[in-house]
Amino acid sequence: MFFQTWSDFFNMGGYGFYVWLSYAVSLVAVIALIVQSVKQRKTVLQNVLREKQREERLQQANKGNTL
């Protein structure tokens, strides 16, 4: 094993703060990207459903207006 103790592992030879901070920043960025993607997908699906319902209402309204 490269590190003798768990404390050495977390300290990373004096660079632990920077190593774990970079992991934390990366994790926050990935989680933010996932949350944003899920929200955007939900918004797009709602817009598609709204547009589909609008088109169906227009077709129903125009159904009786044909010659």
From Swiss-Prot:
Ranges that cross the membrane: 17-35
Any single biological process term in GO: cytochrome complex assembly
Keyword set, alphabetical order: Cell inner membrane, Cell membrane, Cytochrome c-type biogenesis, Membrane, Transmembrane, Transmembrane helix, Transport
Pfam families found in the cross-reference section: CcmD
Family, similarity comment: Belongs to the CcmD/CycX/HelD family.
Function: Required for the export of heme to the periplasm for the biogenesis of c-type cytochromes.
Designated name of the protein: Heme exporter protein D
Annotated organism of origin: Haemophilus influenzae (strain ATCC 51907 / DSM 11121 / KW20 / Rd)
GN (gene name): ccmD
